[in-house]
A protein has these predicted regions:
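Metal- and O2-centered redox machinery and metal/ROS homeostasis
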Residues: 1-78
């Protein structure tokens, strides 16, 4: 699932992870509890869509078109 891949991309870099925590207010402990919830996963993609440099870095790393992130966000709804 693209959202899980995006979360992993964020988590593998301390600065990206710190930015995610600061922007969302979530903690590492809370992520463990909600990681499979569609609303949380939609939020991960929403965070990525709100930061163009993050979005482009993730898309390049994943070998996908950045528009795929928006499409995945739409599929998750909420």
């Amino acid at each position: 699932m693209l959202a899980i891949q995006a979360l992993g991309f964020i988590a593998e870099d301390p600065q990206r992870l710190a930015d995610f925590f600061a922007a969302t207010g979530i903690t590492a402990e809370q992520i463990r509890a909600v990681a499979a919830e569609p609303a949380f996963l939609a939020g991960v993609l929403e965070h990525m869509l709100g930061d163009e440099s993050l979005l482009l870095a993730f898309a390049a790393n994943a070998g996908i078109d950045p528009a795929e992130v928006a499409r995945a966000r739409g599929v998750l709804g909420t």
